[in-house]
A protein has these predicted regions:
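A short glycine-rich, Lys/Arg-flanked "PGG" loop and its adjoining helix->strand segment in the class I
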Residues: 185-200
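Conserved beta-strand signature within the Rossmann-like core of class I S-adenosyl-L-methionine
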Residues: 198-206, 397-400
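Hydrophobic, well-ordered beta-alpha structural blocks that scaffold small-molecule cofactor pockets
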Residues: 96-97, 103, 122, 265-409
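Short, glycine-/aromatic-enriched active-site segment of Class I SAM-dependent methyltransferases
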Residues: 34, 203-226, 230-233
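Extended interfacial segments that mediate partner engagement and assembly in macromolecular machines
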Residues: 44-142, 216, 221, 288-305
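N-terminal juxtadomain amphipathic helix
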Residues: 2-84, 248
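A conserved beta-strand element that flanks and buttresses the S-adenosyl-L-methionine
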Residues: 173
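Class I SAM-dependent methyltransferase SAM/SAH-binding core
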Residues: 119-157, 335-348
Length: 409
């Protein structure tokens, strides 16, 4: 049953088919960025996470979509600049654009959902003229970095306003944003307004194949109404009157897909074997609940054992996706004393959604010689987190909230 305020999806937003099948139900969860200040008694509202799959275009959908105004308020906390893995991935994206499109000097680059302008700053280093569209308070950060930014949700009217002010961009980028957008049909129309024959579009998002292979069920949080395959993007390109010129698979966020779209590609990607492999995605997703049940049992036992021996544990990092395993494992102050974030994070001073676990600064982290294990909530960037912790003197064991071994039968 649809809950008040939610948008229920009844057909595929990519190809239009009504034959969507349910493949995964993770239960009810708070929004991952609904951060309540420490001491505030407000209780986060929870929304269902049910995944539907389209076997025609191989796209995974949230059955119930939370309105964008609730997901991305002006107080949205995420900032790209605070995660090294994200910044490194952005540099590689810019390098890929130079490799494919040549010298960027003087080119107009528009980043939709530009957040704090981190990607635009890298483009600017290469001589590009930089523009952004960003609905949250992060737009102020991007503007302060010297980029021309429209503080609004992306849509046809905003696209028309952009063209009136700045003309059509040469390159349009979406980095982990295309999955966040509420009304895909409206986005397609807006992109048609922005594009001219020479415009290239570069989209990077979580790849459904990597999510399946690495059991990354925690990426199915409310901010991602859709998760895409290469097949998905072939349909999206056709809707735009474009072609998929190339497809890459960066090892970012645990496995991304990066597609390069153009109106008349010099070379067109020939992903036939890839598209054939994606035919099994629906059945693979339908098998995921059994694997998740094994993870839940093993991780619950591992954390309970550590807590029984050491008392409540400290945890490192709160990426929004961690809200899902935290809820599914029933973690609270009895098991996790606090989660520590890099100084300057907007999450500090709040509690983890759906819990009373405080998010504190790394500067408040307890003695580095403490031999208690620590729980890493950012398991998808485990190497970065471990290097950071060891560099700060932490010598204890690290329990990753999700590990591939947890899913083994």
């Amino acid at each position: 049953m649809n809950e008040p305020g939610l948008i229920e999806i009844s057909k595929c937003e990519v190809c239009g088919t009504a034959a969507l099948r349910p493949v995964l139900d993770l239960g009810a969860h708070p929004m991952c960025d609904d951060l309540v200040p420490i001491g505030d008694i407000r209780v986060c509202r929870e929304y269902p996470i049910e995944i539907l799959f389209c076997d025609r275009c191989r796209t995974a959908h949230q059955r119930f979509q939370v309105p964008k105004q609730d997901l991305f308020p002006s107080t949205y906390h995420y900032r790209s600049r605070q995660t090294l893995d994200v910044l490194n991935g952005m540099r590689r994206l810019v390098d890929a654009c130079i490799e494919k499109y040549g010298d960027l000097r003087g080119k107009k680059v528009l980043d939709v959902g530009c957040n704090d302008g981190s990607l635009l700053s890298i483009f600017a280093e290469r001589g590009a003229r930089t523009f952004g569209i960003e609905p949250t308070g992060a737009a102020a950060d991007a503007s302060a970095s010297g980029h021309a930014v429209l503080n609004a949700f992306f849509g046809e009217e905003v696209a028309e306003d952009f063209v009136r002010r700045f003309g059509e961009p040469d390159i349009i980028t979406f980095t982990n944003v295309f999955a966040h957008i509420e009304d895909l049909a409206a986005v397609i129309r807006a992109l048609k307004v922005l594009s001219r024959q020479q415009t290239r579009i570069v989209i990077e998002n979580h790849y459904l194949g990597a999510i399946i292979a690495r059991r990354q069920f925690d990426t199915f949080y409310h901010e991602h109404p859709r998760t895409y395959s290469a097949t998905s993007f072939s349909f999206i390109a056709a809707a735009l009157g474009m072609v998929v010129a190339d497809v890459e698979f960066p090892d970012r966020y645990g496995g991304n897909i990066r597609v390069f779209l153009s109106h008349s590609a010099e070379t067109v990607a020939a992903p036939s074997p890839l598209l054939e492999r994606e035919r099994a995605f629906g059945d693979d997703l339908a098998c995921m609940p059994e694997a998740i049940a094994r993870w839940r049992e093993k991780k619950t036992s591992e954390i309970r054992s550590a807590v029984a021996q050491h008392g409540p544990l400290a945890a490192k990092a709160f990426p929004g996706r961690a809200a899902i395993p935290i809820k599914m494992l029933g973690l609270d102050r009895a098991s996790i004393d606090a989660i520590y974030e890099k100084p300057g994070s907007g999450k500090i001073g709040h509690v983890v959604p759906g819990t009373r676990i405080p998010i504190l600064s790394d500067n408040d982290f307890p003695a580095t010689k403490d031999d208690k294990p620590l729980v890493n909530m950012a398991w998808h960037i485990a190497d970065e987190i471990e290097t950071y912790l060891r560099g700060r003197g932490f010598a204890g064991d690290i329990i990753h909230i999700i590990s591939l071994g947890d899913f083994a039968a």
